[in-house]
Amino acid sequence: MLAMSISYRGSRALYRGTPYLGVDSQRLQQLHTAAKIKLLGITLPPPGGPKANYNIVCWESPTTLYMSGHLPIRVDGSLVTGSIGPGGLTLEQGQEAARWCGLNLIATLQDQLGGDLDRVEKVVKLFGIVSSKQEFKQQHLVLNGCSDVMMAVFEDRGYHARSAIGTNTLPLDAAVEVEALVKIKAPFTR
């Protein structure tokens, strides 16, 4: 079970104008990203490695991170599996899986950036693949789980373009897989 529930539905006014989990939004905006994660009650899973014959989960150019697909792996290492739709996982369970994908992406970002998530300048794009029953047509709503996490953690830097598609199966029977394109700031040097 995720340590928090995000009800952030893409409304900047909701985030800026109201307390979030009892925390004043003005205070949240002034915090470093790592402190914000802690304040929001988020526990990141350990960063994962490749699940097949490739050796990087994230490729870094001077200002961009190209992130391989991340699966919904919980803090305890278990994987959210199954297809979403009639006779399978519910929309809400799919969104929870997408949240775990988002948390895994953030864990990889933190690892890749030496712990400095403030180097994230912009989450540019998410691409989500949803394991779906043929009758299920709400893949875009499943991906809200990942988008909500990005926007809660990175605020305006977390707003992104996004694509969502459905497929009949994913590697390891994962429910969702999400990859990301992230713009980063150069590391601080003296």
Tell me what each language-model feature is:
Residues 2-127, 132-190:
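N-terminal presequence-like segments and the immediate start of the first folded domain
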